[in-house]
Amino acid sequence: MFTITVNDIERIFQDYGIYEHCAGFSELQRYHYEEDDPDSKEVRLIVKAETNSGSAVVIRFKNEADVTLDTVTAQSKFAVLLAENGIETPKIYHANGQYARWYQISGYKVIVTVEDFVGGELKEVDTKTAEQTGRLLARMHNVSETNDFHVQNDVLFHPLKRNDLFSFEDFAVHKEYLKSVHADLYHKIVLGYSHLLEKVRFFENEPQYAVQGDISDCNLYRNAYGTIGVFDFNRCGDNVLYYDAVMQAVFEARLMIYPKEIAKAPEAVILPAFLTGYHQERPFTDRQIEVFPYLYALISAFWLFDMRWSEHSLANAIEQADADAVLNWMKEICNRMAYLPSMPL
């Protein structure tokens, strides 16, 4: 298992221009790749390192199959660009101009980055926070577009690719079983999916720009002046900005922690708050507003949590050969595809 010592951290401090001693450190996040493969040399470790003066920095250690030094460097440069343009982000340190560099530590080769530790992490999302986050995302998009900034990396929220919100593939992989339950309904769903996808494809060839890629409560903080900021550019990459805006909005409206008074139906208030905030900073075009219902229906119909992860998911119903439950899911998917709400601005 990858391990670090205070001496390792002090060496990093020196390289990155932090001329203090390390008073201690704690792990914030660790991926245990060795559990699946004892010989794995893949690493993702994030630590909080405290200095003898009482300040703290976050050090990220990475060695993953899909991560390159160029990618991490570009992600760091994007965070710096945002900060230079008024977006609240933690200070990113550099070692002689390098925001990311390779280290050999305890027998592992890892990419290292260093940034200030920030407090005030947001634990839940209310309508005010959602509106402010929408504004923040729009301003970030404006900076990225204005500066023609790019990061070559896959993102979580692109509707025309594998993504973390919905998956038609998780439906279609069960084609034969679904057809055995109700062939006509299966074909209706496939045709409906094609119709929605064709509408959403309108923006497929739009220019793509760098996005942070994972606006959420666990990656947001509020500074001492009440300004919302963003950290963690691990999922930063190029995306069509409209796709990023809508999918981030739905993500924020469905998958966060919310105050008790809205927790039972957060989307009804969080989604319009987020999109309205975004629209005030970066107005949606008529065409973007027109396409929204189809993208929303696509996300809802094949919502990944319902397709795969929920205890009562379609996948579980199929695994249990519960034909009645599967038929109910097929009917529900049809209903969701038919629900085409206007963009709630």
Regions found by a protein language model. Name each.
Residues 1-94, 224, 341-345:
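Conserved NTP-binding catalytic cores of kinases and kinase-like/nucleotidyltransferase enzymes
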Residues 164-220:
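Loop-centered beta-sheet repeat module
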Residues 127-183, 208:
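A cross-family kinase active-site recognition segment
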Residues 35-59, 195-243:
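Active-site acidic catalytic loop and adjacent metal/ATP-binding pocket
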